[in-house]
Regions:
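Conserved catalytic-core segment of NTP-binding enzymes
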Residues: 115-217
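Hydrophobic positions on the alpha1 helix immediately C-terminal to the Walker A/P-loop
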Residues: 41-42
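P-loop NTPase switch/communication element
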Residues: 65-82
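Hydrophobic anchor at the beta1->P-loop junction of P-loop NTPases
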Residues: 31
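Conserved glycine(s) of the Walker
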Residues: 37-38
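Switch II (G3) loop of P-loop NTPases
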Residues: 81, 103-120
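Extreme N-terminal, non-catalytic leader segments
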Residues: 1-28, 96
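Short beta-strand-centered segment that lines the nucleotide-binding/catalytic pocket of NTP-utilizing
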Residues: 53-68
Length: 266
């Protein structure tokens, strides 16, 4: 039986020549986790970084109660209402648009939203995306609270949405200041069979650094590049020279810490 040349396996996607950016497959990136674990903050960084490097990314803000991404990216797509039928139709149209446009897509739903889980169950979503030349990537954002691992279990159980490109992000912001990151996360790593399952299929763990002046950037609704360059919005003054340096160092540290999974990002 012949092989359909239009069908691309996830294994093929993960083993392409990543040195050539033009051949990197478009990415379907799905960040997930409880509230205040850093997924929207990361999303802002990864979209801004990709676009600054000339890579096109479709931004989808599916959080119907708190559309933070839309405040930073005016072109972000959002559902017209919180009705589940409307949200599901919007999500499916996004996927079709991505397949046709060959652009990367990042979808940020509110904590607890089940739209992707339903699609993953109904469509075998990771296989479907891979077959259309899209690399599925899921990023789980967790803190030291063992309850944070519940989301991982829900995606990993029965391989609901468990692509080869799976990243676990420990957010230092969620750790009490007096506790070292290695100690805060040691028990969850050592005792979690689901984390070991992800690592056994070559998933990755990344510790996301803290940006000390993040609240000042958010007050101004600035992008990170804007903040580092001394821009501002409204009546607030621009960041001081020291905080601008903090932003630049944080940006460099983010690039470094995510370097092992750079080919999995938009």
């Amino acid at each position: 039986m012949g092989t359909n040349p239009d069908i691309v396996s996830e294994h093929d996607l993960l083993n392409e020549d990543e040195e050539h950016i033009g051949t990197r497959p478009p990415v379907f990136l799905f960040p997930t986790g409880r509230g205040n674990r850093g997924k929207t903050f990361f999303t802002r960084w990864v979209v801004e970084d990709a676009r600054n490097m000339g890579r096109e990314v479709i931004v989808a803000d599916g959080d119907c109660t708190n559309q933070t991404l839309s405040a930073y990216f005016p072109d972000a797509s959002s559902p017209s209402s919180a009705d589940q039928v409307t949200v599901t139709k919007w999500f499916e149209e996004l996927i079709e648009a991505q397949i046709k446009s060959r652009k990367s897509l990042i979808v940020d739903f509110g904590a607890g939203d089940r739209t992707l889980k339903h699609a993953a169950h109904d469509l075998s979503l990771d296989t479907f995306l891979s077959h259309h030349g899209i690399r599925p990537v899921v990023i789980h954002f967790v803190g030291p609270d063992p309850d944070d691992l519940a989301s991982l279990h829900s995606f990993e159980t029965g391989n609901l949405f468990a692509p080869a490109a799976t990243i676990i992000v420990y957010n230092q912001f969620a750790i009490p200041p007096h506790v070292p990151p290695s100690a805060a996360f040691a028990n969850s790593v050592a005792k979690s069979t689901v984390i070991q399952q992800i690592l056994d299929r070559d998933g990755e763990i990344v510790v996301m650094p803290i940006l000390g002046c993040a609240h000042e950037i958010e007050r101004r609704r600035l992008g990170f590049i804007e903040a580092a360059e001394g821009q501002t919005k409204g009546d607030l003054p621009s960041l001081g020279l020291i905080d601008r340096q903090r932003v630049r160092l944080w940006q460099a540290e983010m690039k470094s810490r995510f370097s092992n999974v750079a080919s999995w990002l938009p």
